[in-house]
Amino acid sequence: MKHLIPVLLAALFLPALASADETVLRVSAIPDESPTQLQRKFAPLGAYLEKQLGMPVKFVSVTDYPATVEGLAAKKLDLVWYGGFTFVQAHRRTGNAVPIVQREEDATFHSKFIVPANSPAKTLQDLKGKSIAFGSPSSTSGHLMPRYYLMKNGIDPEKDFRQVAFSGAHDATAKWVESGKVDAGALNESVFQKLLDEKKIDASKIRVLWTTPSFYDYNWTVRGDLDPKVVEKLKAAFLALDYSKPEHKEILDLQRTKKFIPTKVENYASIEEAAKSAGLLKD
């Protein structure tokens, strides 16, 4: 997944949609969770955006992270839910992708390294010689930042682990660790907590080994040449979501936040530098 090469191939996985169709807002999201969960999260938000914009809103499923980048570049997508690293890739690929809002939590996001509850590991160093699972190769919290902090701690994943595997999604990583398929996994803190809260993983079989320092992560990004009036309406719609209103609470709960806040390109400079340091992006 290095150097953005797969992004150029990702259009093969996108539906055959007309480019730059401004009669329908085409929305997508990086597939960091199961397709069923992504559709469930988007349904009430999509209905809300339709009312606020006065135009149809369509969710476009994709098969992998690079497909969202190529979709935005090819004007087949208008609004995308990105992790920080995939946003950086989209901005480099298009030159004008604009992040408009993020969840309040995304200004201070973390990744978790998890292990089976009975693992003898006490530090990251104890994982040397073991197997580890990341999420998608393009995931910020499921690959880039965990890899970056492993390297900062003197651990080279390709040299120091017995096996490096990619589960494809945060929930899959947790399941792999819970089942003992791998000795450790790195994933998004928000998804990990959701899995625990919903009892989709057994808290008695898994524990957190290490938590990364904070970083900027997810955001909603628009293609740079989208009608400015639509962009402003979108931004206003997200910022108007109020957790105290019952009709908004469901939307925000599914997005795992209580509030959206404005964001900007500059917030993701540290993500870009981390990707370069980890060898996942060229200068």
Could you say what each language-model-derived stretch is?
Residues 1-4:
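Positively charged n-region of N-terminal signal peptides that target proteins for export
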Residues 6-16:
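Bacterial N-terminal signal peptides
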Residues 21-86:
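Extracytoplasmic small-molecule ligand-binding "clamshell" domains
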Residues 22-28, 33-44, 217, 221-283:
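An extracytoplasmic/periplasmic, membrane-proximal ligand-sensing/linker region
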Residues 32-35, 105, 114-120, 135-142:
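Short coil/turn segments
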Residues 66-80, 93-94, 125, 169-190:
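Short helices/loops that flank or line small-molecule/ion binding pockets
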Residues 70-126:
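Acidic, polar ligand-binding/catalytic clefts
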Residues 119, 130-229:
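Pocket-lining segment of extracytoplasmic ligand-binding domains
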